[in-house]
Amino acid sequence: MAPPPSLAGLQVEATAFPPSVKPPGSSNTLFLGGAGVRGLEIQGNFVKFTAIGVYLEDNAVPLLAVKWKGKTAEELSESVEFFRDIVTGPFEKFIQVTTILPLTGQQYSEKVSENCVAFWKSVGIYTDAEGKAIEKFIEVFKDQNFPPGASILFTQSPKGSLTICFSKDASVPEAANAVIENKLLSEAVLESILGKHGVSPAAKRSLAARLSELLNGCK
C-alpha cells in the first residue's frame, strides 16, 4: 500500500481544514484534496456563503494517476472529465461544508436538491428512486439551522451510501444524523460542488493544484 499523501491543511476564511480526517460512517482516514469558498456576485460584491473542504481516500491517487498523471493544475482545473472521475471514482469521499453566513437547513437542502435534479435531468437518469432519495434528503435538513461556523458533513461510500452529519463547529462528530442509500444522490452532492456548473470554482482550483502535484509524484 502506498504511503498516504502528504499535503498540508488549508485555511479558508475562518475555517481550518486539517490535512486528514476520519469521517463519520467510515473506518478510513481521508486526506484533504482541496478546499475553497462558495460565493455569489451580489450587486457587484462577491458574497461568501460557505467554506468547502473535499477529502479523498488514499487510493484515489493511484486510481486517478492512470489517466491524469502528467497534467498541469490548469489542465485539470479546466477538465470536466477529471472532476467527474473524482465524483464517480471507486473510493471514499468526505465533504465538509462550514457556514460563513447563517443558513437554514431548508435553504441549503432545497438548493442542493435543485442542483442534483437539474444534473440528473441533463444526463437523463432521473427516476422514482432518486425522487424518493431527494425527499429524504430534504427531510433530514428540515429542522436544522446553521449559524456561522456550523458544519454540514457528507461521507460518500463507493458502495452508494451518503452519510449526513451536522456539527455546531468545524469538528467531526462520530455519529451520523442520517444515511441515505442512493448512489446517484451520493455522487450528485459532490457533482453540485465540483461539476461543470459546480458551486465552488475555488475548491475545484485547489483540488486540481494539489492533486496535480500528487499525481505527478506517482511512481
UniProtKB/Swiss-Prot annotation:
Q: What is this protein called?
A: Chalcone--flavanone isomerase
What InterPro entries does the entry give?
CFI, Chalcone_isomerase, Chalcone_isomerase_3-sand, Chalcone_isomerase_bundle_sf, Chalcone_isomerase_sf
Gene, per the UniProt record: CHI
Bilayer-crossing regions: none
Q: Where in this chain does the entry annotate a coiled-coil region?
A: none
What else is noted?
Answer: Part of the biosynthetic pathway for all classes of flavonoids, a large class of secondary plant metabolites, many of which are brightly colored.
Purpose of the protein = Catalyzes the intramolecular cyclization of bicyclic chalcones into tricyclic (S)-flavanones. Responsible for the isomerization of 4,2',4',6'-tetrahydroxychalcone (also termed chalcone) into naringenin.
Amino-acid positions noted as binding substrate in the UniProt annotation, renumbered to this chain:
T50, N115, S192
The protein's UniProt keywords, in alphabetical order, are:
Flavonoid biosynthesis, Isomerase
Q: Write down the species.
A: Pyrus communis (Pear)
Catalytic activity entry? a chalcone = a flavanone
Among Pfam families, the record links this protein to:
Chalcone
User: Is Isomerase among the key words of this record?
Assistant: yes
